[in-house]
Every structure is written in C-alpha cells, then in structure tokens.
C-alpha cells in the first residue's frame, strides 16, 4: 500500500493510533504477524504491572503470537515518567532497526506517541517526594483545576482523573516555574514514520461490549486485589474504569451504575483522544470497522 512506500528503503516506524476501543490492538497483531515484526505499546497505564484487564492489555496468547514491549515495565507504586518511556522506546526502536525490522508503535496515549515520533525534548525534573506528598493530600478535582490555571495546554492533554500525569505536570511547574507544555522542544528522528489512525462509527457499542467483556474476564476481582495490595489511595486506582469499579466495590453504586459510568467516561475520553489525534495532519485515517482492513494495508 502507498502508506508504506517510504518504509521500503530502510526500517522506520509504523504508528497505529486513535481513540480507545477502535480495534488498534487487533489490527496491530495481524499486521505485525504479516510483517514479521514487533509491537511497542503506547499506553500510559499498560506500562504498569498488575493493571491488566481494565487497561485492555494484550492477553498471554496475543503476546505469544507477537512480541509486545513497553508493557509491565513499572511497579504500580512507581511513577513512570514520559522521559523514561521515551528513552526505552527509542532504545527498542534502534535495537529492532539494527535487525532490519520496522516496529509498530500502538496505542492511544497521544503524548507517548508524540514523544517518540516528534522527539520531544522533555524536562529532566527529578521526582519531588515532599511536594508530591503535599499535593496528594488534595482531591484530584482540585489538582486538575489548578493545572488548568497554570498549564491549560497540558490540562487539555491529560484526563481529568489521571492523577499520575496531573501531579507530574504540576511538579514540573513548581520546580521550574515554567509550564510543562512550554518546555517540550523537538528533535524529530531521522527514520521514516507512517501514521495510521483508526476510528469507528460503532464506538459506543464497542465501548459497551469491551466493558462487559472486561467484567467477564474478572475485572472486579482484579480491582479488589489491587485495593487489598496497595490501598485506596493508589493513584492508578483513580483512573478511568478503576475508579468506577472501586466505587461499586465500596457499595457506593450498583454494578449497572458502575458500567454506565464507565461507558460514559470512556466515551468522553475517546472524544478527547480523537481531538488530539485529529490535530496531526500526518495521520491517515481508516475505518476500524472494516473487516478487510488488513488486506487493504497489504502491498498489491
């Protein structure tokens, strides 16, 4: 396909991005098998161990089909920074280029993808333990509202419930006095990049079905285990889906209400993802509902 013409002369990078639940993972696995290559995850929650079902991590079987990287690289109590992710991703890309492979970078975390494909120059601000402890005493709604005041550009990029990234953006601002969004220069990589975006006209249905499938796989048990293991204050348990299931486990909502809230908040999140990716003119958009999508991507 013409999309891949710039990758014929030397190894590069194929990006598969777009809103959640549009079929990125399925297409990526099929395409990686066809191209005999690997998948690099671009998901800010899949980097954490033990957060499996609710983050839609690839299954053991899928990881046996195709090698996946940048999954389970941090402990749930760690703070995996954008700089750490970028460094590991760049090392892996270089490693596979030396093998003559063009890896796939797959996910819905726009900032992760941007950090790799545009070579963002990220502020090297070390974690501020005391500052984080003070900020963590505030409600996430308060933290996010403050971020909207001091760094509205970063706030637009970060989900309102994402305490990890909210704290990081505030941390950079407190230490340097300059918003994170104003400190990210660029040094784009020299290798060719092909960007594919997926969207779906059946997104609400897909989100509903995926939420139910997660519950069937034992999502509630996963959340209960994480609560017992790490406690109610773990920032990751305040993120999309986990927060709603945690409310249900605490008896604050019925299961049906938790499902409805998860679907609603996921739809809102998907809308923000779409807005983010639509701003990138280099992305070629395809229909994730197309059953012949892989065939259309193949040469000839």
UniProtKB/Swiss-Prot annotation:
It catalyses: adenosine(37) in tRNA + dimethylallyl diphosphate = N(6)-dimethylallyladenosine(37) in tRNA + diphosphate. Its cofactor is Mg(2+). GO terms for molecular function: ATP binding; tRNA dimethylallyltransferase activity. Signal peptide: none annotated. GO terms for biological process: tRNA modification. Its EC number is 2.5.1.75. ATP binds at residues 18-25. The record marks 109 as: Interaction with substrate tRNA. Disulfide bonds: none annotated. Residues 43-46 are annotated as: Interaction with substrate tRNA. Keywords: ATP-binding, Magnesium, Nucleotide-binding, Transferase, tRNA processing. Substrate binds at residues 20-25. Monomer. Belongs to the IPP transferase family. Catalyzes the transfer of a dimethylallyl group onto the adenine at position 37 in tRNAs that read codons beginning with uridine, leading to the formation of N6-(dimethylallyl)adenosine (i(6)A). This is tRNA dimethylallyltransferase. It comes from Cyanothece sp. (strain PCC 7425 / ATCC 29141). The lineage of its organism: Bacteria, Bacillati, Cyanobacteriota, Cyanophyceae, Gomontiellales.
């Amino acid at each position: 396909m013409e999309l891949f013409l710039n990758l014929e002369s030397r190894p590069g990078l194929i990006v598969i991005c777009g809103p959640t639940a549009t079929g990125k993972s399925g297409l990526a696995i099929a395409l990686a098998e066809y191209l005999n290559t690997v998948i690099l995850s671009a998901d800010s929650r899949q980097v954490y161990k033990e957060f499996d079902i609710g983050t839609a991590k690839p299954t053991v079987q899928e990881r046996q089909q195709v090698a996946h990287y940048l999954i389970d690289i941090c402990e749930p109590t760690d703070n995996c920074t954008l700089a750490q992710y970028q460094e590991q991703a760049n090392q892996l890309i270089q490693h596979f280029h030396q093998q003559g492979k063009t890896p796939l970078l797959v996910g819905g975390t726009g900032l992760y993808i941007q950090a790799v494909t545009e070579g963002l120059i990220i502020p090297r601000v070390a974690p501020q333990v005391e500052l984080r402890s003070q900020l963590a005493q505030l409600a996430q709604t308060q933290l996010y509202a403050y971020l909207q005041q001091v760094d509205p550009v970063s706030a637009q990029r970060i989900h309102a419930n994402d305490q990890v990234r909210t704290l990081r953006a505030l941390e950079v601002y407190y230490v340097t006095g300059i918003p994170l969004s104003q400190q990210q220069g660029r040094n784009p990589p020299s290798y060719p990049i092909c960007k594919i975006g997926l969207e779906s006209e059946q997104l609400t249905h897909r989100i509903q079905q995926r939420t139910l499938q997660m519950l069937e796989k034992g999502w509630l048990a996963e959340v209960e285990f994480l609560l017992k293991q790490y406690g109610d204050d773990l920032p990751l348990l305040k993120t999309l889906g986990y927060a709603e299931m945690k409310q249900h486990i605490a008896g604050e909502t019925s299961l049906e209400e938790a499902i409805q809230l998860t679907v609603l908040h996921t739809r809102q999140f998907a809308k923000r993802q779409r807005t983010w990716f639509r701003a990138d003119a280099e992305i070629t958009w395809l229909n994730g509902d197309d059953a012949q999508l892989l065939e259309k991507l193949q040469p000839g």
